[in-house]
Amino acid sequence: FEGEEVFVEKTPFGVKAWVTIPPCGAVTLVPYKKKNVEQKAVSAEKTTDGIALENSQVRVKINKKGEVTSFVLKESGREFAADALNCFHFYKDVPRMFDAWDIDSNYREQELEGAFDVCTELVADGIEAVIKVTGKIGNSSYTQYIRLAKDSRRLEFDTTIDWKELHRLLKTSFPVAVYAENGINEMQFGYVMRPTHRSREYEKDRFEVCNHRYSALCDASHGAAVLNDCKYGISMNQNALELTLLRAAAAPEMRADNQVHHFTYAFTAWEGDFAGCDVVKQGYELNEKPRLVPGCVPTFSMASVKSGTVVLDTIKPALDRSGDLILRLYESKKAAGKAQILLNVDAKKAWLCDMLENKEQEIVIKDGMLELEFGAFQIQTIRLSIEEAMA
């Protein structure tokens, strides 16, 4: 695009390209005959124990059950797998009340046989290595594609399950080599911290908590996280993150959950403290995939943010149909500081607003840029007047 050759490869899943897309923007790709053959960006090798994957960031080993037995960051050589990651746990699940709502704490005492008849197969490498895993759990069958992309520290588990259970609970466990007394669970515009232990009586009822795009365990030197695109229940038990994948309630509808389910979750790790990691960005990337449409436009970016922790979450038209644009930003890591918002629209004026988009304070646009102070977890809404530019 824009005269630059990009890494493109035909795979069993279609043509894939490695492209840098500007924030809140677009690029145009045109066909081009490749002159030079590049080395594989992700190598994959079959071993006696399973399959080994490696790119510029990580080395990963996956056994014949589709479990991750090793996840090493190459920058430090640190091993993050305390035990097998992506290990399925299958439980009997019969709540005393509210069948489709509650999970009782005694489910751990009723574990059943997990995955069986598991087969693994290497189906692609190059721009992205892909391992296909098939198997059975109870009366159900599943297919999982484990993906590691070029220059990525995110190992994705693209999963489809034909769920045929009743009163059953399925989790996947990620025991990591991180000591943390509290785990981090993302919520709307921030996160909450919850204990990973059960030392106090009231914490025994926190065996299942909610999260949005990620949950993380970290100390002052390193950390790891489980990301997801649609699964919001998770357990944090000592050093293990256990994501709830599926349940099978009998009420109010006997077989409401018996269907084919598709979802993706992922594992990532980093060196350094939580404030400096990119787990929020990784969570957005997993959930907000690029959209492909036919057409041709110059490369552009509507707006971007210069800050390690402030996120531009929303760009939308104003509710009053005035033609103004609304930008909503938030501080994501409990780290107060300044943020520069670079605007690539011809905005004439800008205001800080309340959440209902009512103007509160005019702010100065200087050289196409706004500069704002953010408190920890602060949400700020900006209104841009672009009427003259559009006229």
Predicted features along the sequence, with ranges:
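C-terminal (or distal) subdomains of carbohydrate-active enzymes
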Residues: 1-391
